[in-house]
Amino acid sequence: MRFFYDCEFIEDGRTIDLLSLGMVTETGEELYVVSTECDISRANPWVQRNVLPKLPNPSDNAWCDRRGMRNRITSFWKQHNDGNPMELWAWVAAYDHVALCQLWGDMAALPHGVPRFTYEMKQYWMHAG
């Protein structure tokens, strides 16, 4: 199964603090989670203008701590496992992959079957012409 995802995060050149993650399967099922642990006071002007105003109300069920994010993502993957190897896809995926993996600690702690890389949609698009 292919899972397409995008993360919003706050980064300062040394740390990547996951703010939210949206994920969709190739068949259209969706997951959206927002971190209650992200320090939004550190958001840069772009995130302040383009991300924070679009987040759901804090009472929305999408909000959870990092452990809750990890558990919901793991459940989503298990629920939509079609028996084929899992593929992760994202547009300009480098930081997204790191932010996702850090929910488990290091990459060695990822659940069995979760790839240690994300396919890069922008590179694929550029190479395809």
Residue ranges and their predicted role:
Residues 2, 16-18, 25-56, 75-129:
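Metal-dependent phosphoesterase core characteristic of DEDDh/y 3'-5' exonuclease domains
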Residues 64-78:
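A short, well-structured juxtamembrane/interface segment
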Residues 2-10:
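Two-metal-ion RNase H-like nuclease active-site motif
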Residues 54-64:
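Glycine-rich phosphate-binding "P-loop"
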Residues 11-15:
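Short glycine/serine/proline-enriched coil/turn segments at secondary-structure junctions
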Residues 63, 67, 91-94:
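Short, well-ordered coil↔helix boundary/capping segments
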